[in-house]
Regions:
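Residue-level detector of functional hotspots within protein domains
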Residues: 10, 28-30, 94, 99
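A residue-level detector for conformationally permissive "hinge/kink" positions
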Residues: 5-7, 12, 31, 38, ...
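Bacterial Sec-dependent N-terminal signal peptides
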Residues: 1-22
């Protein structure tokens, strides 16, 4: 009886955790702690479920920009960066507008990259 309950709980937790996972995948170079070039357009790219809508929200523009993942799962967006500062920025990526499956990049700095 205890083993059956334990098996049921394990199965339930696996199912619930898979519901909250996003299919957004980013290359290693795009991550928390990155530095982006100031006052330019930077390319953010990755992979996701084909046909899904990918949106990016930055704390410096406070608006969403979005695109659709291609048949080969790839997507990309260009984001305009602000002037350099010491402020740590946040970029949130969502799939199909779902906030529960978002990918958050924190501690993003804007400055001179050379």
């Amino acid at each position: 009886m205890i083993l059956r309950k334990l098996s049921l709980l394990t199965l339930l937790s696996v199912c619930l955790s898979s519901l909250s996972q996003t299919s957004i995948r980013l290359p290693d170079i795009i991550s928390s702690g990155m530095v982006l070039q100031q006052q330019t357009e930077v390319k953010i790219w990755g992979k996701a479920t084909p046909g899904s809508r990918i949106s990016i929200h930055t704390d410096w523009t406070r608006k969403d920009i979005s695109t659709e993942a291609d048949a080969d799962s790839t997507w990309f967006l260009r984001v305009t960066t602000p002037k350099a500062s010491w402020h740590q920025h946040v970029i949130a990526l969502r799939e199909n507008g779902n906030a529960t499956t978002q990918v958050v990049l924190s501690n993003v700095l804007i400055g001179e990259v050379w």
